[in-house]
C-alpha cells in the first residue's frame, strides 16, 4: 500500500486566518490519523497577488499552532520549469490550443448562452484557430459526450459528478497575463510530490473534476479527495483575506484550534484544550473515528 502523503497549500496573499486554520487542521489531522506525511506548499505562482514576506509569516504561524511539515516547504514560483514541461507534453499530444478571446468576448458569449438557456461553458471559439487574433491564453481541450463526465467519491461531500463539456468547457492552463493557471500548477505539484490524499475547503470542490481530467491527460495518479465545509462570515460569504478576515495569533493557538475543531464537527471535551499536546491527541482520535483507518461506519 502506498504511504499516505497529504499537503496544506496556502497562497501568500496575506496572513493566515481562521478559514485557513480549518484547512490546515483538517489536512494535518488526516495525515496524522493515517500515520502519513504532511507537507506544506506555498502557492505563490500568481505573482501580482503575492505579498512579500507573507509566506514566511504563514510558516511561522503554522509552527505556533503546532503544524510542522514533515519535509521542507515547496514554493510554486521555483517550479515554473515543471509547468512548462507539462504544457509542452499536452501540446505535443494535441490536447492544448492557443486562445485569443478577451475576457469581454468570453463574458458576452456566456451571457448570450444564458439568454438562450443553453450551456454556460466556454464555447470553444478558438478550437479551430485564432481567426486572426493574437494568442492570449492556452486551453486544454475537453472531450464531448460520455468522456467529458468525471465522477469521483469525496470523503466528506460523497458522490460527485461534473460534465466538463457542458459545465466548464476547454479550460485555461496558462493565462493571458503569462501566469500559470491554478489547475495546471496544482496537478503537476501534487503529482511530483506523490500526494495521495488532498484535504481542502469545499470552495475548491468545483475544480476537482478538471484536476482529475488533467491528471489523466498527464498520466498521473488521482489522489483521494476530502472537501471540508468553508467558513462563512457574518454576511454568509466565504471568510477570506479579501473580506477582512482577522489574522491568527500564534501566541494563543488553543481557542482558535478548539473553534476550528468544532467547525469540523469534532466533539472534544474541556480537557482537550488544556495544552497543545492534549488538543492534538484528542483531535487526532476524533478525526480518526470519522475519517481515519478506525472510522466507525
UniProtKB/Swiss-Prot annotation:
Keyword presence, Plastid: no
Residues reported to bind Zn(2+): 99, 101, 122, 126
GO molecular function, one term: glutamate-tRNA ligase activity
Sequence motif 'KMSKS' region, residues: 238-242
Purpose of the protein: Catalyzes the tRNA-independent activation of glutamate in presence of ATP and the subsequent transfer of glutamate onto a tRNA(Asp). Glutamate is transferred on the 2-amino-5-(4,5-dihydroxy-2-cyclopenten-1-yl) moiety of the queuosine in the wobble position of the QUC anticodon.
Motif residue range(s): 'HIGH' region: 10-20
Protein name: Glutamyl-Q tRNA(Asp) synthetase
Alphabetical list of SUPFAM superfamilies matching this protein: Nucleotidylyl transferase (SSF52374)
InterPro entries noted in UniProt: Glu-Q_tRNA(Asp)_Synthase (IPR022380), Glu/Gln-tRNA-synth (IPR000924), Glu/Gln-tRNA-synth_Ib_cat-dom (IPR020058), GluQ/Sye (IPR049940), Rossmann-like_a/b/a_fold (IPR014729)
UniProt entry keywords in alphabetical sequence: Aminoacyl-tRNA synthetase, ATP-binding, Ligase, Metal-binding, Nucleotide-binding, Zinc
Cofactor note: Binds 1 zinc ion per subunit.
Amino acid at each position: 500500500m502506498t504511504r499516505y502523503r497529504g499537503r496544506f497549500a496556502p497562497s501568500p496573499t496575506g496572513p493566515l486566518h481562521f478559514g485557513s486554520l480549518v484547512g490546515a487542521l483538517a489536512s494535518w489531522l488526516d495525515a496524522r490519523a493515517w500515520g502519513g506525511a504532511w507537507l506544506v506548499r506555498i502557492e505563490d505562482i500568481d505573482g501580482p497577488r503575492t505579498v512579500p514576506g507573507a509566506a514566511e509569516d504563514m510558516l511561522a504561524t503554522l509552527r505556533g499552532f503546532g503544524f510542522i511539515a514533515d519535509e521542507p516547504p515547496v514554493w510554486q514560483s521555483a517550479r515554473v520549469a515543471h509547468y512548462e514541461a507539462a504544457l509542452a507534453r499536452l501540446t505535443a499530444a494535441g490536447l492544448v490550443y492557443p486562445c485569443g478571446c478577451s475576457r469581454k468576448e468570453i463574458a458576452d458569449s456566456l451571457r448570450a448562452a444564458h439568454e438562450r438557456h443553453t450551456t454556460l461553458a466556454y464555447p470553444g471559439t478558438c478550437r479551430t484557430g485564432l481567426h486572426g487574433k493574437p494568442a492570449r491564453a492556452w486551453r486544454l481541450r475537453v472531450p464531448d459526450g460520455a468522456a467529458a463526465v468525471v465522477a469521483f467519491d469525496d470523503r466528506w461531500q460523497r458522490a460527485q459528478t461534473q460534465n466538463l463539456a457542458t459545465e466548464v468547457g476547454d479550460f485555461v492552463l496558462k493565462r493571458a497575463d503569462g501566469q500559470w493557471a491554478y489547475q495546471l500548477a496544482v496537478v503537476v505539484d501534487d503529482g511530483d510530490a506523490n500526494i495521495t490524499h488532498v484535504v481542502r475547503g469545499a470552495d475548491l470542490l468545483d475544480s476537482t473534476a478538471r484536476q482529475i481530467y488533467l491528471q489523466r491527460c498527464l498520466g498521473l495518479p488521482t489522489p483521494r479527495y476530502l472537501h471540508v465545509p468553508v467558513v462563512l462570515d457574518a454576511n454568509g460569504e466565504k471568510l477570506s483575506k479579501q473580506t477582512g478576515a482577522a489574522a491568527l495569533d500564534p501566541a494563543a493557538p488553543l481557542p482558535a484550534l478548539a473553534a476550528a475543531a468544532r467547525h469540523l464537527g469534532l466533539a472534544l471535551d474541556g480537557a482537550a484544550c488544556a495544552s497543545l499536546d492534549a488538543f492534538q491527541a484528542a483531535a487526532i482520535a476524533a478525526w480518526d473515528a470519522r475519517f481515519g483507518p478506525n472510522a466507525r461506519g
